[in-house]
């Protein structure tokens, strides 16, 4: 391995390690926002816990979504063969939305029945989705020279997979700010079938490509 290639590999590893650290910190902050009062006794602890139910619900939803973003980020960066500054800048933009997730989750958990906090929550997650789409668009440019090559059809499918959650969340934000809070909540249930359908299509294309090879 040449000296330049070794330096590129170290920089790529640092980018990925930094990203994992940001995810770990964001997940820690999600739990750190759930606090009981400092002075409680045995007779009131369960009633106090009950008042935290919205925060726990927000934490569980946010943990699931943060795990989704980490898995998507892992899937994308594992294909990178060399360090690239445009990709790194897009990665930082993606991490900006991950860092904002604990703030959005805490706001949502404290005001779960209000429209605006839910809209804000969906906007942050839509930002994560669209910024990841931008990152993959940049890192797969030039025929995928940074990731070992990629066809136009597969690239389009991967970009659609990355952007699909953002479209669902943007729709949820629109409904939340329009006052249709129950339609906005329905967006969380839309996400799973959309991702599953795109995953099935991606699997079929990969098997077809493997047979052709």
Task: Describe each PLM feature range.
Residues 2-213:
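Multi-pass alpha-helical transmembrane bundle typical of ion/small-solute transporters
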């Amino acid at each position: 391995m040449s000296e330049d290639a070794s330096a590129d590999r170290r920089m790529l590893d640092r980018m990925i390690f930094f990203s994992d650290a940001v995810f770990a910190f964001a997940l820690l902050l999600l739990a750190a926002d759930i606090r009981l009062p400092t002075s409680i006794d045995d007779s009131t602890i369960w009633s106090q816990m009950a008042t935290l139910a919205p925060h726990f619900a927000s934490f569980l939803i946010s943990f699931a979504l943060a795990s989704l973003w980490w898995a998507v980020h892992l899937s994308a960066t594992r294909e990178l063969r060399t360090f690239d500054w445009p990709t790194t800048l897009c990665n930082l933009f993606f991490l900006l939305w991950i860092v904002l997730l604990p703030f959005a989750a805490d706001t949502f958990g404290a005001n779960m029945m209000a429209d605006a906090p839910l809209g804000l929550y969906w906007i942050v997650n839509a930002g994560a989705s669209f910024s990841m789409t931008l990152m993959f668009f940049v890192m797969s440019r030039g025929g995928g020279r940074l990731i070992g090559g990629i066809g136009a059809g597969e690239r389009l499918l991967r970009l659609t997979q990355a952007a699909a959650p953002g479209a669902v969340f943007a729709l949820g934000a629109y409904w939340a700010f329009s006052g249709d809070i129950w339609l906005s909540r329905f967006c969380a249930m839309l996400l799973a079938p959309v991702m599953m359908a795109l995953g099935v299509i991606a699997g079929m294309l990969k098997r077809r490509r493997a047979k052709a090879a």
